Structures are given as structure tokens and as C-alpha cells.
């Protein structure tokens, strides 16, 4: 199983949107996919509940309580994890431990850029990332061609 953690310490950058879009796209390609919601708002779980029955299946996992982290079925191709906002400390370490890819959404704003840079610096302090066992990727969200940072 491959696991993608969608995370950023900055709120409002589209973590949930990116997570649910990734999960749906992977499921449409025929992969066995679960979407773990680690955000107390539970937006990913609500999105799964609202999907039409004919949509490609995505298995819901409720990781909002710390002890549930890591609880995933064995027969999955992909696990997509929707991280909470302000992820740090032990929670960040636990979620990164479950992941081999980390996607950090970034919106085109000076404030978001600064917060994301700080988040990426903190990720580098986590041993799994530092040793190259979890790759880190930044995804531009709500960006338009030719548009400068606000």
C-alpha cells in the first residue's frame, strides 16, 4: 500500500479538497483506495457520505482520534490521509509515519508561502522525511497562470 498525507500547518489552503480529489481520481483508475480523515472537522468523511452510490468506491477511515491513526485495511492500493490544520508535534510524526508521500497544498499568497516554508522546515526535522523515506511535494492550489503572489 502506498500512502499520501495531504498536510500543511496553514488552514484554508485546500488540504481537504486536494485529499478528496486525489482519493476519487485514484478510485476512478480502479485502485482500492481509503480516505483517512484526521481533521476534527470531519470534512472528508462528510464528502464521502455525499458521494453518489455509482461513484468509484473510496473506503472511509475515521482517524480523528489519535489512537485510530494507522488503523487501515491491509488490502489497499492507496491510502490518502487528510491531515488536520495546525499539524505539529506528535500528531505530525504519527501521520508522517504512515506516509511515503506528503503533499502540501499552497495558495498564491505571501502569508501562505511563509507558513508553508515554515511547515516544510518542520517536516525536515522529522526523521522519516530527513532520511528520504517520505517524499515531500508542494501543490499549487487556486493558482492562475501569470498571477503573482498577493
Segments predicted by a language model, with ranges:
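P-loop NTP-binding core
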Residues: 1-150
Amino acid at each position: 500500500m502506498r500512502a499520501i498525507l495531504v498536510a500543511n500547518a496553514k488552514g484554508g489552503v485546500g488540504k481537504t479538497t486536494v485529499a478528496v480529489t486525489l482519493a476519487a481520481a485514484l478510485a476512478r483508475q480502479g485502485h482500492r483506495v481509503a480516505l483517512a480523515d484526521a481533521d476534527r472537522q470531519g470534512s472528508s468523511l462528510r464528502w464521502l457520505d455525499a458521494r453518489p452510490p455509482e461513484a468509484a468506491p473510496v473506503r472511509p477511515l475515521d482517524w480523528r482520534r489519535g489512537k485510530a491513526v494507522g488503523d487501515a485495511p491491509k488490502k489497499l492500493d492507496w491510502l490518502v490521509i487528510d491531515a488536520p490544520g495546525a499539524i505539529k508535534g506528535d500528531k505530525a510524526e504519527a501521520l508522517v509515519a504512515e506516509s511515503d508521500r506528503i503533499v502540501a497544498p499552497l495558495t498564491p499568497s505571501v502569508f501562505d508561502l511563509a507558513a508553508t516554508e515554515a511547515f516544510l522546515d518542520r517536516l525536515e526535522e522529522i526523521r522519516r522525511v530527513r532520511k528520504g523515506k517520505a517524499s515531500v511535494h508542494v501543490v499549487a492550489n487556486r493558482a492562475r497562470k501569470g498571477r503573482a503572489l498577493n
